Amino acid sequence: MTTTGSTPPRKNRSNVTGGEGGSLEEYAWRAAGEAAAAKKATRAWGVSVSLRSHFSSLVLLLLLLLVALAVSATTKNGDPAETPHAPPLPPPASIKLPSSSSSGGGECDLFSGRWVYDEAAYPLYRESACRVMSEQSACEKYGRTDLRYQHWRWQPHGCDLPRFDAEKFLGKLRNKRLVFVGDSLNRNQWASMLCLIDTGAPELHTSINSSRSLTTFKIHEYNASVDFYWSPLLVESNSDHPLRHRVADRTVRAASINKHAAHWTNADVLVFNSYLWWQRPAMKVLWGSFDNPAAVVAAAAEEGDEYAVSKVIDSLRAYELAVRTWADWMEFHVDRARTQLFFMTMSPTHLRSDEWEDAAAAAAGGNHGCYGETEPIAAEEYRGTSGTDMAFARAVEAEARRLGERSVAVRLINVTRLSERRKDAHPSVHRRYWDPVTDEQRRNPSSYADCIHWCLPGVPDVWNQLLYAHIVS
């Protein structure tokens, strides 16, 4: 039995709390764990003694104070066996690194800057030189002749973005595993990382192996791997198949992530993203199983719970539930002393040209998306409206702050603002098509232009330079 409820009104986006206050049964185990921890702490303090003199009382009280301090130190997070670890870095939307400018001093916000045309130093590699180039990103191969999009360098205000050095990066990655987890935009970034490594150290022995949702790029001399795991909605969903994921009735199991986590639980560096696949008014959330729905339906009917199977809810609320599940897993399973966690902010789309064109041009030409665009948007203050929903960003920020309070550091890599200006850097019509282009599409190229993903070399290389700066610096 599937129950479809009406979509609740979108909450005030200035007050997104990342799922605080939810009453789902799936999170009952957290309350039980907290109660057990409280009970344990109560037992630790429940000491009764018989004192014979004021002097012995003072000595005993001092001893109890020392014991209490020891108990407090070893029972942080309710786990006395937990390995001590350093306090985490703060997880704001913008991460600041020491300035590398000649003026020196202070810190530099790598996410605030401008695009500078630099034909001498960019791109970081040639498309034809990358032996592992993605067919979806090979814009030059598929007919794009205006190559200015390859030569733009991101210039932060007050410092320089470190140039990607493959040998230095692999030195940090020796005997380690880096995993990108997310949707096709995270795969876009993973493909960029492979090209940066492949062209930066072409003499190395590398190999690629795929097993369903997991693809592994192995650098044998370093015993290192850079993997991509397909998980477009972070939690389990009916879009998890790496090829057959275009489904009309998109459904998520907002409280279930273990099936995915099994594939990246031993990673040393994890890079997550999830946004694009949530861009619809409502989402069906399933509390049963994709594998045995009949049994779940029968159990729900027997218990008289009409919402035990599924319910259609506002997509933002579903996203908050999913990100909370992700954060809960990180809190209780990640190795704080070993694993570095990153979350990429929203990659913007350029589907509506009227967002950057003046009114007259928009009225005369109609909407053409990114088709025919060859230059970035110059205005630093430009903000797109249709391609990014900041309420989703705030949901991630809220969970990152919550994890930070629990000594789990998540660095948010803010690629949204710098990428918003690059309307020129999408594949548009210059990519491989898995289905033949129709005559109608040929008459109106903008109707099938890809204004979501990115050409390589291009914008995702800058994302990886930002990631590189955090890992290496």
From Swiss-Prot:
Q: Which GO terms describe its biological process?
A: xylan acetylation
Which segments does the entry list as coiled coil? none
- Cysteine pairs forming cystine bridges in this chain are 108-159, 130-195, 139-455, 370-451
Q: Where is the composition biased (Polar residues)?
A: 1-17
Question: What residues sit in the active site?
Answer: 184, 450, 453
Q: Where is this region: Disordered?
A: 1-22, 76-101
Per UniProt, the enzyme's principal EC class comes to transferase
The compartments listed are: Golgi apparatus membrane
Q: Per the annotation, which location comes first and is thus the protein's main one? A: Golgi
For membrane topology, the record states:
Single-pass type II membrane protein
Q: What is its EC number?
A: 2.3.1.-
Q: Which residues lie on this side of the membrane: Lumenal?
A: 76-473
Could you tell me the keywords of this UniProt record?
A: Disulfide bond, Glycoprotein, Golgi apparatus, Membrane, Signal-anchor, Transferase, Transmembrane, Transmembrane helix
Which is a Gene Ontology cellular component entry for this protein? Golgi apparatus
What role does it play?
Xylan acetyltransferase required for 2-O- and 3-O-monoacetylation of xylosyl residues in xylan. Catalyzes the 2-O-acetylation of xylan, followed by nonenzymatic acetyl migration to the O-3 position, resulting in products that are monoacetylated at both O-2 and O-3 positions.
Family, per entry: Belongs to the PC-esterase family. TBL subfamily.
Q: Please identify the protein, giving its name as recorded.
A: Xylan O-acetyltransferase 14
The species this protein belongs to is Oryza sativa subsp. japonica
Q: Which classification does the entry list for the species?
A: Eukaryota, Viridiplantae, Streptophyta, Embryophyta, Tracheophyta
| Encoding gene per record | XOAT14
